[in-house]
From Swiss-Prot:
Annotated transmembrane regions: 8-28, 35-55, 70-90, 123-143, 152-172, 185-205, 209-229, 246-266
Cellular component per GO, a single term: plasma membrane
Ribosomal protein among keywords: no
Membrane topology (UniProt): Multi-pass membrane protein
Function recorded in the entry: Mediates zinc uptake. May also transport other divalent cations.
Taxonomic placement: Bacteria, Pseudomonadati, Chlorobiota, Chlorobiia, Chlorobiales
Catalysed reaction equations from the record: Zn(2+)(in) = Zn(2+)(out)
UniProt-annotated binding residues for Zn(2+): E137, H162, E166
Similarity section: Belongs to the ZIP transporter (TC 2.A.5) family. ZupT subfamily.
Protein name: Zinc transporter ZupT
Amino acid sequence: MNDLYPALLLTLLAGLSTGIGSAMALVVKHTNTRFLTLALGFSAGVMLYVSFVELLPQSEETLLAGMPSQAAAWVATLAFFGGIFFIWAIDQLVPDVENPHEMSYIGRMEERVPDSMRLNRMGLFTAAAIAIHNFPEGMAVFFSALSNQNLGIVIATTIALHNIPEGMAIAVPIYFATKSRKKAFTYSFLSGLAEPLGAIVGFAILKPWLSPPVFGSVLAAVAGIMVYISLDELLPTAEEYGEHHLAISGLIAGMAVMALSLLLLA
């Protein structure tokens, strides 16, 4: 596994981008919501395109090394929806009021006069919620990078963009509750460490059985996880921050850039 350490490094960098989000929230008075809308839409486009055009076909190709073509198609399909169910089940563990993808206060908190204890609780629960979400995201980056390092770089970048507003979601309420930039940044930074931790745990569990059928199934599950993240988190959050058409423009641009990248790297 010569690609093990680069894959882990990519996962770590993607996770720690929550720290970038918290720094932006603490330094910049007003968040550029149009940029966030475009960036989140772009990330969704990249993840959707790469899931259907690259990961699923690669999953079936890997599965074919250990089973007939029809069986490979069935396993890839079941693993894809299994990945969707896995991330959906994790989402159900997080109450809506603490769910980082249901918040609309980022960049507008200074306009409110909220209760500091409630804000602090919200920030801490948001950090825990994001840490839970980061587990499967870390696995997605890690196993994609193990499969193809260039693909891993692309997915790590899109997950990193996705993590920036999540870092803001943690830092803003904690800062306004405690007036401590250090505490707000620390909680945000630590929540990002769940991504490499998720990668390590996932790899440790699957390593004894990491045959072509298992690896192919994991790739299909990763595709399912990324599709769910795109449709349930990235696009709704993008639209919450800005205009519908701007989010869709980012989505199409992300697909186009990913398509061009795959053609150039082929």
